[in-house]
Amino acid sequence: MNNSEFSKIAETVIAHIADRIEEQNQDIDVDLQSDILSIDTTDGIYVINKQSAAKEIWLSSPVSGPYHFFYEQGKWKNRAGLELMSILTDELGIDF
């Protein structure tokens, strides 16, 4: 995947996450600026952003810590096989 393809896919998924949270939970504050998504919850602040050089999406979770995800077969996974959307669903209670 080239840089342009990565950017498009990463930006789309980050915007999708923001949209789904806003649709499903009005009590969570969402702020998306320059491909950095901040999610303010009662547990703390989540930060999701793209890392173009590594072609990864990074998640900082106040509940479970930091993660790096790569795109594989239509899903964002980390080296342990955990999926970005599954972690967010488990921790935020949002269906993605």
Curated annotation (Swiss-Prot):
PROSITE patterns recorded: FRATAXIN_1, FRATAXIN_2
HAMAP family: CyaY
GO CC field: cytoplasm
SMART domains given in the database record: Frataxin_Cyay (SM01219)
Protein role: Involved in iron-sulfur (Fe-S) cluster assembly. May act as a regulator of Fe-S biogenesis.
Protein name: Iron-sulfur cluster assembly protein CyaY
Gene name in the database record: cyaY
Any GO BP annotation: iron-sulfur cluster assembly
Organism field: Rickettsia bellii (strain RML369-C)
GO molecular function: 2 iron, 2 sulfur cluster binding; ferric iron binding; ferrous iron binding; ferroxidase activity; iron chaperone activity
A Pfam family recorded for this sequence: Frataxin_Cyay
Membership in a protein family: Belongs to the frataxin family.
UniProt keyword terms in alphabetical order: Iron, Metal-binding
